[in-house]
Structures are given as C-alpha cells and as structure tokens.
Amino acid sequence: KIIGVGETGLDFYYNNSDKDVQIESFQNHIEAASTLKIPIIVHSRSAENETYEILKKNYNKDLKILMHCFTGSSSFATQLMPLEAYFSASGIITFKNSLDLQETFSKIPNEKLLIETDSPFLSPVPNRGKKNEPSFIKFTAEKLAQLKNMKTSDLIKVTTDNFNNLFFN
C-alpha cells in the first residue's frame, strides 16, 4: 500500500538538474498526492520561495504536507503553517551551529512535529561524522524534547501520534 509521495521537491543547491524540470516534477507529485489523498514528503534546499509558492498555489483540502529534514528559516516555517504542514527534525538540530533551526523548531506547534534519521546521512551529535543509523534517532528526540521543554518519552508519543495522524487518518 502506498502511504505517501516522495521524497520530492526542489533542490537548487548544486544546480545538478534543470529548475523547470524540478518544478514540473514537483507539481506532478503534488497532484498525485492530492488525487490519492496521501501525504507528500517535501524536500526543499535553497528553494524556500519557490517551494512555498508551488505549495500555496496547489494547496487543497486533500493535500497533506510533510517537510522532510526541515532546515528552513523561521519565516519559511511560518509561511507553511497555514498549509497545515508537518515538520520533521533530523540530526541537524543537535549540531552546535544550528541555533536558528533549534529556535525555529522550538516554535513549531507540537502537533506538527516529527523526527527522522535521514540515514545514512546527518548523524546527530554525539555520532556526527559517522554513518547514521535508526538507533541514533534517540539523540534527535532528546534534543527536540529539550527544545520543547518536554520529557523525551512525551515527545516520542507526540511524534508517533503525529505520524499516525498524517499517514493513517
């Protein structure tokens, strides 16, 4: 059973593929997710404005949005809130130079939070630089719980409930 479309979106960081092709593909994936009434898992790198404009233009009641491995700005997160987007934190939030991202996640409503590993990349501290693995998600959960002033066990329940609401409701 298909439960989501993605990871898809826009990545203008390396300029490895034509922007227009990326945009067309992203729009097609949004249409498919809406038609199937399943979430779209969105990757956005160096493309906040374009990603937001496309999501806003294509937003409808059947479109459920998950911002995968979210590293966007606080203003980008704020723009996405009316679209009822979910935001997934990766190991990046544990990095000491991620203060802006930590601040952003501290303000995202609990009911819109998820956590992920993005294995084999982006290992959280204390495993930064090593190949990421699923067991390392506990460090991301601990950091996000700290940022949200919650017990880690409560954060895990919240993010599990959010996952189920997003993908199975």
Describe every region a protein language model picked out.
Residues K1-L83, E103, P126-S135, M150-S153, ...:
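Divalent metal-binding pocket/active-site signature
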Residues K1, L99-N110:
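Short amphipathic alpha-helices and their capping/turn segments at secondary-structure boundaries
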Residues T71, G91-F95, S119-P120:
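Short, acidic/turn-prone active-site loops that include or flank metal/cofactor-
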Residues S88-E103:
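Active-site glycine- and acidic-residue-rich loops that bind
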Residues I2, A85, E111-L113:
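Short, conserved active-site loop motifs that form the nucleotide-linked donor/cofactor pocket
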Residues S135-N169:
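Mid-to-C-terminal alpha-helical segments outside catalytic/metal-binding sites
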Residues E111-E133:
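Short acidic/histidine-rich active-site segments
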